[in-house]
Amino acid sequence: MMKFAYEANAWGGVVGTPGAVTDLGSGFYVTPGDVHHTIEAIAAAGYTGIELFDGNLLPFEESIDSFVSAVQANGLEIAGVYTGGHFIYSDAQEDELARFDRSIRLAALAGARHYVIGGGAVRSTGRRAQDYETAGAFLDTVAERAQAAGLIPSYHPHLGSIAQAPDHIDALFAATSIGLCADVAHIAAGGGDPVAVIRKYADRLAYVHLKDLDHETNAFLPLGAGDLDLNAIIAEVVDAGYHDWITVELDGYEGDEDDAAKRSLTFLQNVTFTDPARP
């Protein structure tokens, strides 16, 4: 059964913890602002789940139960926790793994279902073939640790990362066994066809991020406000056998955050999520 969640970064965007400038082991994504306001806004919009960055769990590291209680008091579940890393620098992986271990522990203690990993650094000289092999092996290690903690790991292709364009995605997924978090707007903005990517990796589809896109400006928009064929995309998700959290993410949107969340949920509530070919 499909359930709908919303990413907290719609209210405040994303920054990084400052220690990461000099210490790879301390870098976390963070949405600035009042996380409790965001929880309330997502619940008020009608969603039943929330996704947030691992860095937003750091203030609750010693009191995670209080955070979980606040989420549950608003009728929400933690659908996922999002993180990222470099992956490609072999001599830095020990420090990166220490950070991932901390991140995984936080996500597991919070009761998250999905553990979403973005990133993969791009060198100043560009992407190298060996970087995909190095990143793929690293992602396998992180995925194994996440699974051992009871999480469902997936990799999220993203603009500006090692896996931006379709051939980048193919190169990375040939080198790793981690599942796919299909962010349909990032895939499209990177030059890909979300339907084709989901179909190609249907047996590895582990999680879904939905947002709409204006192809002309590459602006991310509420569902139904852009030019993606979201009905065809959702039909492909269903055809892949996926029946789990659908998380709406709207980073970088300049309109009203509360209204955008409600508009996207209204769109989803008018979509058919069943496959008529199935009994």
Task: Identify the residue ranges that each predicted region occupies.
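Short, hydrophobic-biased amphipathic alpha-helical segments
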Residues: 249, 257-268
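Active-site beta-loop-alpha junctions enriched in small/polar residues
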Residues: 9-11, 53-55, 83-88, 120-122, ...
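Gly/Pro-rich active-site loop or hairpin
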Residues: 14, 18-32, 126-129, 166, ...
